[in-house]
Amino acid sequence: MNIVDTRARNTFNFVKRKNIKNIPLFELSFLDHSIDISGYTDVIFQSTPSVEFFNHHKDLIDKNVFAMGPGTQSSLGTKGISSKIPEDPGSEGLKKLIKSSIGSGKFLIVKGQGGLNIISDYLEAEGAEVDTVQNYQRVRFSSYFDISKDFDNADFVIFPSRLAAEIYFQEIYNPDINSKFVTISSRIKDYV
């Protein structure tokens, strides 16, 4: 069985995946995000790359740290940072989890450029103090010609992000190849 994961190369490095070929469809690059986090009580990481590109891990010791799901929590754990995750991974589950922290908390959301605003919009609507920092960007490749043949024998293609799915269907998809698709969220599934 041939399984292709389209996750960016520098994410989930801590997970050993046997029998899964990683073929990234975009790169991640660092964005400068110098920020004093001393005034924040709660820090939310929206993705594994937001953890990996964050410059202030040592300053999280006295903060309430939240992760969007188990992958992001694992990434924080490899850096020695304890975090809470929702019972149901994703924005809706996280809203329920952070509801009790809203009153007196000041939130910092760490995410990639162009990342979802669902949590920040929710916190603002609830009257919370919230700031967002974008510490990485997703960069499309200039061409997909050379990697498209790597998908010809894929039984399954995994999409960890909507961008990966968009790129795949715009640049690589061949209706003559009978691959099945796996998504990590209902939002990506709805797109696929």
What does each model-identified segment do?
Residues 1-192:
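Signature of uroporphyrinogen-III synthase
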